[in-house]
Amino acid sequence: MEKNQKINNAAYDQLNKDADRILQLIKVQMDNLTLPQCPLYEEVLDTQMFGLQKEVDFAVQLGLVDREVGKDLMLRLEKELSKLHDAFTNV
């Protein structure tokens, strides 16, 4: 049972790292490259979020992450991205 918990924790940690990586990528993009209204920005964000959602779905299907935990992770990232977007557009 302990081995399963380690695997579950590792899966969740990796999903969190991927979510943080997306947030950092978007921060860099907003700071250096494009505006939030730019189609390139939207394309990168949509692609990254889609990929992370598929990772979460896969982890849930394997029983590595609880469905609610996966939803919470996605909601947390969406809220952080929304705050970042608001901060950038309200400057």
Curated annotation (Swiss-Prot):
Pfam families xref list: DUF1507
Domain of life: Bacteria
SUPFAM superfamilies: EF2458-like
NCBIfam families (UniProt xref): PRK13666.1
Family affiliation: Belongs to the UPF0358 family.
Protein name per Swiss-Prot or TrEMBL: UPF0358 protein SSP1677
Organism: Staphylococcus saprophyticus subsp. saprophyticus (strain ATCC 15305 / DSM 20229 / NCIMB 8711 / NCTC 7292 / S-41)
Lineage: Bacteria, Bacillati, Bacillota, Bacilli, Bacillales
